[in-house]
């Protein structure tokens, strides 16, 4: 029986009512191999390559063919015409519009990659070289060519004298600024080498961690201490972001607002909000302030970057500013180790806030500055007090920043004239005495420094012009101070007037506001997430 009859009878046996009847296979049809198997078998049958006696290739094998078919590109305008072009008037108009919105902290530029940013940003820092004015073309090329004339950037002696005067004035201004910054410094006195403990936060490892966080973040939160916002700002990082990473967003968070009154916090927020979006914040897992505003602005940035699967938010700032505490507050549980001492966070750490927002904790950094003295670095919380040698030398700075009545109320002592007498009275009251009844000034000084940095002693630095600003803040409402969280105050103390120090470091003797109770603040829900003069509820 032939193949055709066998196949036909097989279909009859299987039944014609099947949904998928078998295909009728005809003799001569290759249904055992597919096209891939056939190509492989043909390669085997092609044989090996043939070579002559000289070893030259005579006939290549099937898989050794080096002949390439001629390729031809489709004559399409998509490949041979300009794709993104813009006329000069349109570019000028767009540059002017960008210049008005570029410096606005509340304007966000989307789809930056599709814009010719190199054409929009003119590099005006490089001065133009007036070649033809300083060196004419005829004296450079041609029969009269000579290059004996020096290349100068001015045309006449008057311009030379003017430029010399400007350089001399700039040099004298730098000398005056140096004298004002270091009034005790003279040319005959050489400053001693700074203790290595005051270089904390400036190591190469710390800066490597910082740049990892900056590179990995879409939004950066700079955490400031509400008691000294200007002293805890990282100007070096802000300039780096402005020049090298302008596509990243910056937010300022004024932490520890429970240690300052509402008027001062509102004044600082109003000043800082002119540069970046600013939020007043109090880090606490159970009783926080500003949490809703911060989450709202992070949601806004996440919605702006809808093309990304998620965004990363990095927290940077000085040591002991409260970066890890803010993350714990947002998560409402302890996910980062926190301590009232600087240097608790050693490496960066990723924390998931929600599905599309991730937080990055960064170690504290201290930008190097020649204007910061050892006492200022210590009082900013950069250095651990237990590692400082001769801590009693920094007590005069503490006494100059705090009011006498605040120290009297905190330590229940009075009647001292200098720092030595203050430490002696405090040591005798606490029973910290050495052999022979001598006061242990070192241990008492460390206790005072810890109380100063942890908020037990009321103090802070207010903005300049707070007393003379009659528009937003009453002249009688000057810088105020408040005791730390958990301190018990009776009604008589709550009615007491509070004073602080202005930005120039001088004590303020006029009337001021009353202290604000902890946790009594209402969160603002405006678009810029900025706290103004709202009562805390």
Curated annotation (Swiss-Prot):
Role, per record: GTPase that associates with pre-60S ribosomal subunits in the nucleolus and is required for their nuclear export and maturation.
Record-linked InterPro entries: G_CP_dom, GNL2_CP_dom, GTP-bd, GTP-bd_ortho_bundle_sf, NOG2_N_dom, P-loop_NTPase, TRAFAC_YlqF/YawG_RiboMat
Residue ranges, compositional bias (Polar residues): 468-486
Location within or outside the cell: Nucleus, Nucleolus
Protein name in UniProt: Nucleolar GTP-binding protein 2
UniProt modified residues of type Phosphothreonine: 484
CDD domains: NGP_1
Residue ranges of the region described as Disordered: 1-24, 468-537
Organism, as annotated: Schizosaccharomyces pombe (strain 972 / ATCC 24843) (Fission yeast)
Binding annotation for GTP: 317-324, 361-365
Biased composition regions of type Acidic residues, renumbered to the chain: 487-496
GO cellular component: mitotic spindle; nucleolus; nucleus
